[in-house]
Structures are given as structure tokens and as C-alpha cells.
Regions:
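Catalytic cores and adjacent flexible loops of soluble metabolic enzymes
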Residues: 1-220
Length: 220
């Protein structure tokens, strides 16, 4: 894998040499706009690197980057504009922004690491110490679990909870056999093991097939 830093995104000879190697490429885009990103991608691809082997990282080249300058949604703009894998190179303080980037779909996270934030140099204060790095990785792994498959359906625990959380049509009062079900003698209560309240209109006006006690589940 070759990592192209933000400062080299306009270095045509360098981009050509990397492209000719036909390896996986991670391209950082700090200080650049969409046109500069397009030019860099065109050079890499024309030189021989497959588009599917390129990941473009949104980045704010500022140490530390202020939250209001991060513009994390630009990562999605890059993804949608170039139909390419994206990630995020972070220079903000803390671990919140990389976690948010992972939630938005970043496939790569770059974060600087330091043993001492007080060391000389521009990026130590925006870097993570060992404990923070471990916390960030745990959080991102949790986010990966949370993303799911995108299909809206009840989870297995939710399926088990349906019976006690949802509701059924029940007798509001004692109901005698032959009595007509109406809004004055039926109600909606837990548990959800009887007739769904979504069938309310089809129950109203029907005759009771037997006697029902107050709060008993209605059966047709």
C-alpha cells in the first residue's frame, strides 16, 4: 500500500511513479478541492492503478483541526462524486470525529499517534496517546457492529419482546355471548398475544362468540 500525503496531491511526477507501481493507494486530500482530487485520480488511473484499488481520504490540514473546519460531510461528497472508496485522515483533538467518520461509512481511518503530546512538532497535540488510540479503536469496532445490513426488521431480542411490549384487543367490561363489540366494551392493552389493534375496525360490529371477562383477550 502506498500512502500519498496531502502535500503531494499536486505532485504530478510523484503521482505518475506511484500509479505505475499498480499497488493499492491511499490518497489524502487536505487543502484540495474536487478538481484537484479529480486531477490526481486521473493521473493515478492513467498511469496504471486500478480505481478499485484507490481509497480517498478526506482531510483537514490543520494542527489541531478545529471542529468547525472538519467538514466531515465532504467525505460523502468525494464518495458520491467519484464513486470511489473513501476514508478520513484526522487532525482534530480527541476521538469523536474519527468515530463519526466510521459511522458515515469511512473504510479507512488515519489518526496520528504519539507517546507524549508535549513533544515538539506540529501534530503531537492532535495525536492520540496509547489509551486514547485503544478507546478509538474499540468505539469504531462497536460502530461497525451497529451498522448492520440495512434491512429494517425486528432483531431476535425484539421478536422475543413483542409479546410483552405490543398490545391486543381486550374486553373493557364483561361481555356476554352475542353482544356486539363496540368502542364502549373493548379496549387495547398488553400483552400482544391476542388480536392486533390494527384489526380494530374488523372487530367492531362483530358478535361475541362467547362470554369474556374484563381484560380478557378477545378471540373471534
Amino acid at each position: 500500500i502506498f500512502k500519498i500525503p496531502s502535500g503531494e496531491i499536486t505532485n504530478l511526477p510523484f503521482l505518475r511513479k506511484i500509479g505505475r507501481l499498480r499497488k493499492r493507494v491511499i490518497l489524502s486530500t487536505g487543502m484540495s478541492d474536487l478538481n484537484e482530487i479529480k486531477q490526481a485520480l486521473d493521473v493515478l488511473i492513467a498511469s496504471g492503478t486500478l480505481k478499485k484499488n484507490i481509497t480517498v481520504l478526506h482531510c483537514t490540514t490543520e494542527y489541531p483541526a478545529r471542529y468547525r473546519d472538519v467538514n466531515l460531510l465532504a467525505m460523502l461528497t468525494i464518495r458520491d462524486t467519484f464513486k470511489i472508496d473513501v476514508g478520513y485522515s484526522d487532525h482534530s483533538q480527541g476521538i469523536e470525529v474519527p468515530i463519526a467518520a466510521a459511522a458515515l461509512g469511512a473504510s479507512v481511518i488515519e489518526k496520528h499517534f504519539t507517546l507524549d503530546k508535549n513533544m515538539p512538532g506540529p501534530d503531537h497535540k492532535a495525536s492520540l496517546d496509547p489509551q486514547e488510540l485503544a478507546a478509538m479503536i474499540r468505539a469504531i469496532r462497536n460502530i461497525e457492529l451497529c451498522m448492520g445490513d440495512g434491512i429494517k426488521k425486528a432483531s431476535a431480542p425484539e421478536q422475543r419482546n413483542k409479546a410483552c411490549v405490543r398490545k391486543s384487543i381486550v374486553a373493557l367490561t364483561d361481555i356476554e355471548k352475542g353482544e356486539i363489540f363496540s368502542e364502549s366494551n373493548i379496549a387495547v392493552k398488553r400483552p400482544g398475544t391476542g388480536i392486533s389493534p390494527m384489526k380494530w375496525d374488523s372487530v367492531i360490529g362483530r358478535k361475541a362468540a362467547r362470554d369474556f371477562k374484563t381484560d380478557e383477550l378477545i378471540r373471534l
